[in-house]
């Protein structure tokens, strides 16, 4: 979450008049994240999240995102829900941008997740994959392998400003992944951004998943790869196999991976690392000064790309199944 667009109190009061949320008592911007402008609202009826959808979010995708949250909640997954306006619509307009008021989910994200939390995340991810079955809307993953080269072109010329030799290394990496990317694995709706700041806990109990604005249709195992990258590396860049084992066993407590998914996991993890490297690199080079947003270091994901290049078997991630050692 982030803030790119400021709003005035008068604007917000007029906007909230279309919702049954009571009277505004306070609001503040939320700086974490990089995609939309988000505010925590307090009213006489409780707490809510206000989201203004910025230019990277295609307004045509919003019915998919909001509909998915509704679908998942109906099937028992704990996630935020968009509130309807007086006219029944889920979207309004504020400061020239599509905007929605979302229910507030209790809990906090963990700054230092441990293995037990990784197991909970793996299990919740599998439950989300199950709960999304039957959701009829479709959204291709614009940030999968077909989208990486256009994204790379936006940063390629300046890549060596971040680290010498980066331009050539990433060009080689991208070409390899384009050639070897899997073509046939189990598919469904994936979260595609299940980082620690998008998972809430109350104590050690997972209380819900948030921020579905990258959700799309893609390989289910690609979602697992994203989680391995975002949950199982330590700050020094080392991979914590205990966390990896916990996350994978948590996932497989609900849904077992196929042999093809097990074989593809190292490549999916490598591609996932490149995807987040590329978006971080673009934001690092182009985020306007003064934006209330936390820029994230792309080199963190360069370290992960290099780690995954050396992986031979999914067993090295902590997957303890016969197929992983084949």
Curated annotation (Swiss-Prot):
CDD domains per UniProt? HomoserineK_II
Q: Mind telling me which NCBIfam families this protein's record contains?
A: PRK05231.1, thrB_alt
- A single MF term (Gene Ontology): ATP binding
E.C. no: 2.7.1.39
Catalysed transformations (reactions): L-homoserine + ATP = O-phospho-L-homoserine + ADP + H(+)
Its source organism is: Sinorhizobium medicae (strain WSM419) (Ensifer medicae)
Pathway assigned in UniProt: Amino-acid biosynthesis; L-threonine biosynthesis; L-threonine from L-aspartate: step 4/5
Keywords of this entry:
Amino-acid biosynthesis, ATP-binding, Kinase, Nucleotide-binding, Threonine biosynthesis, Transferase
What's the family? Answer: Belongs to the pseudomonas-type ThrB family.
Lineage: superkingdom: Bacteria
Gene3D superfamilies, per this entry? 3.90.1200.10, Phosphorylase Kinase, domain 1
**What is the gene name?**
thrB
A biological-process GO annotation: threonine biosynthetic process
Protein name (database record): Homoserine kinase
InterPro entries found in the cross-reference section: Aminoglycoside_PTrfase (IPR002575), Homoserine_kinase_II (IPR005280), Kinase-like_dom_sf (IPR011009), Pseudomonas-type_ThrB (IPR050249)
